[in-house]
Amino acid sequence: MPRRSDLNHVLVIGSGPILIGQAAEFDYSGTQACRVLRAEGLQVTLINSNPATIMTDPEYADHTYVEPITADFVEKVIAQQAERGNKIDALLPTLGGQTALNTAVKLYENGALERYDVELIGANFDAIQRGEDRQKFKDIVTKVGGESAKSRVCFTMDEVRDTVAELGLPVVVRPSFTMGGLGSGMAYSADDVERMAGEGLAASPSANVLIEESIYGWKEYELELMRDGRDNVVVVCSIENFDPMGVHTGDSVTVAPAMTLTDREYQKMRTLGIEILREVGVDTGGCNIQFAVNPKDGRLIVIEMNPRVSRSSALASKATGFPIAKIAAKLAIGYTLDEIVNDITKETPACFEPTLDYVVVKAPRFAFEKFPGADATLTTTMKSVGEAMSLGRNFIEALGKVMRSLETGRAGFWTGEDPVGELGEVLARLRTPTDGRLYDIEYALRIGATVEEVAEASGVDPWFVDQIGGLVELRAELTDAPVLGEELLRRSKHHGLSDRQIAALRPELAGEMGVRALRQRLGIHPVFKTVDTCAAEFEAKTPYHYSSYEMDPAAETEVAPQTERGKVLILGSGPNRIGQGIEFDYSCVHAATTLSEAGFETVMINCNPETVSTDYDTADRLYFEPLTFEDVLEIYYAEQRSGEGGPGVIGVIVQLGGQTPLGLAERLEKAGVPIVGTKPEAIDLAEDRGEFGEVLRRAGLPAPRFGMATSFDQARRIAAEIGYPVLVRPSYVLGGRGMEIVYDEDTLEGYITRATQLSPEHPVLVDRFLEDAIEIDVDALCDGTEVYIGGVMEHIEEAGIHSGDSACALPPVTLGRSDIEAVRRATEAIAFGVGVVGLLNVQYALKDDVLYVLEANPRASRTVPFVSKATAVPLAKACARIMLGASIAELREEGVLARTGDGAATARNAPVAVKEAVLPFHRFRKADGAQIDSLLGPEMKSTGEVMGIAHDFGSAFAKSQTAAYGSLPASGTVFVSVANRDKRSLVFPVKRLADLGFKILATEGTAEMLRRNGIPCEEVRKHFEEPSADRPLRSAVEAIKAGDVDMVLNTPYGNSGPRIDGYEIRSAAVSMNIPCVTTVQGASAAVQGIEAGIRGDIGVMSLQELHSTLVS
């Protein structure tokens, strides 16, 4: 079937910001789709609110709209294209996760698609409904002869209670049309049911929840399937969850292909999956179906399906080399599977099901340390913020590699402290899944538990437990052997052990380098295998490699020789986590593409299956490997050998992937690896407070005063000397507590007692905190002789809120010419003083007309993609070229950088871009079910970001809020309760809200201040105050939970009752999903955004239009 000739213009909806449950995998999917559609001659319009994505680069679509993904804004895009005589023919919603699917459903239901004659392709409305609606899907499973868990769809709490009475406790609560298990959970008591079902009904766009019998402890499997318009179906991959039912699949270790299924069970699952796919009606494209098997009797039930490309699709694509999103896009425009050629073999068609001769393991990355008090129990609500994937010739090798890929400070088993407790305690702990369960399983086996005891306690299949048991036996061999001989060392490496693990068991080898030296002496190195989709039946034309230690010393590597071009290795950023996300992958991808175009051979090393960088055709070669010193060095040697007789490896880039590669720079350089760009010594200089302070002193640049304390008395003296408030950050942290702003001595003592372990080895840093200062972020390039300012961003929140969590505007909204010139001079002095070659990010605070330097990072920052989108200058591409020898003058001449001027001087008519952080507070709860605090501070907590662009700040800010959290209210009630120090500053914003017609609620002190300033308000009592006969008021929290508040303005108090009151207020706002502003500056910005919304003139603008304006 040829491509449909009636389709000329396709709209692709992206997935928006990185969220828990919906992450970078959809950038990978969407980027693939856009490239394929344009290659087929179609015009592509894209809408996505996330500036950190590759897909929102202007070259991937004809019209790129960085706009909120709501039915309103998507309709504005469709209308704008129609008005310009450029009608959109079809909407492809299956590549942007749940966000895109839900938006497509709304556009269908509100008639927008019919109004503009836009067809849904990939999955029609009925198929989406049948796949996503719990009851309809259950009916389909029954119709095709399958079985579902006993359950009922409920629309009211009364229906929920009746269903629970019938099924008995525990039950699983699952809302419809949500992602990452949001709102779902296991309810063990009537109280759990009331809370979870109430929130689930609120979380579900269709206002219903499924109450389901508990299948906790069953084995969980997934199938990834694809279907074309001629009803050809392929099963791309089977995936088995290491963890049993009850742990969300995104939080589970998963294995491909499935390890413990019999062929009979697999064939039954496959047949059922294909029948369901046909009955649901996914005409073209991919879908994911989840199954559960009772380990006691083999009963098979169908859990759910995603009638779209999903998180598992990205994993399956990277695991097999079968590009699901790319093929789904081709199927959506009319091709059939037999007409699509496999990119890796270049000769087999896509209707050949992939075959694996290796094992793939994915493991989740958690960030519980960022949310003190959050319950770390793993449940049906997804909590992980990222993931790593590894490939090996056997399960245990792949498991070892993925454990060291997670970058948790360990290199696998035995490289950290052992779990605590006697055997009975460890087995009891295994009954409640947590992120430390792998270590508990190994430890339980090591101290005497049987495989059966561990399997029974943990719910993990005995086969997996036995595999870890094999490692425990190997450990005993390693510790007991008088001499570590070649056979035992080779077998240890074959079982996935890192040099660090072996060194931990053999102290006489004097650490990792000693093990490495022994391996080199014995000639024990990994071979590099190729992912080829067909178990070596056909030759792979795409160099996509993974390492394995073979028992046969004569095993050959599959890295092909390449002697013509100089090789550049690019170290990626590893698993996403809070503080190091997709923004760094963006810079790595840009480096790969631009350096390939410049004539280098690019080699990407990364272990994150969600990203564009690990697509097999992003770089010239891809190694899916852990980003550790050992693994990177082995790849370097393999590439050097493959380039013998030619230029070989001419450089390794560590500057673009965030902290992970930077942490390897010094050791790699000492091992003889050529680091290009800013040298490791310069990176160290910028991070050393004393040395960097000397650079600032020589340049005459002020920085906030600070001191190091090794006791509370010393900390108290330093704080008294430099003045409160102070910012304290311990060098050794307990319980995940990081930095905190402290306003008085009592709070300082409480914080140090609670959060730190002070000693001469572990001092605490006490910084003067610049209250009410404006924070400024600068991204710049330096080639050693010239500095190019990429962009100057003004933070909307005050200094003290982590820059990754603060909204910011570009160009700056309140800075004058003299301020920006001061920023330029300071940035130039720092770049030359540190010795930067490439990118530099500097953070400043402006207070009382003095510009203070807060910190400098000589690397790509998380704002690089945002600045690049806002200014039309590809900073990461320019950085890569500079690191390999190009000058800023040459890049200006080529048109890569602006020919004159730079990002410090923006045109007067330049649109305003606002970046807003997206925070995951609603995902985390305390052990008692209470919400965690949504207060912002110096510790970063956001998972992603959005961007709003408009011709004025208010409209841009309103867009950013709509994209991140939903629209700001245009009317209704605002609750205000602020600290005394903020009351004067908040008078004007609150007065403006009252003038706009908002009703104001306030607690006693705030209400009194507002009335004195002529602002009418209604008083409510504080949460911790008891009602009395003379003040029978309802509390602020009661008003919020009753749905009577549309926005909250709440700034934090001290540590006593009001502080707790603030926590309860903010938690209620998060649970009710209403805007909650916790800074004065945020309140002022929100008021401007509300005014813009009320004016009703917020339009849409493509990046191509924006960039043509800026260039002209």
Curated annotation (Swiss-Prot):
UniProt-annotated binding residues for Mg(2+) 2: 304, 306
NCBIfam families: CPSaseII_lrg (TIGR01369), PRK05294.1 (NF003671), PRK12815.1 (NF009455)
Spans annotated as Carboxyphosphate synthetic domain: 1-407
Region feature Allosteric domain, mapped onto this chain: 966-1112
Name used for this protein in its record: Carbamoyl phosphate synthase large chain
Annotated binding of Mg(2+) 4, by residue: 855, 857
E.C. number: 6.3.4.16, 6.3.5.5
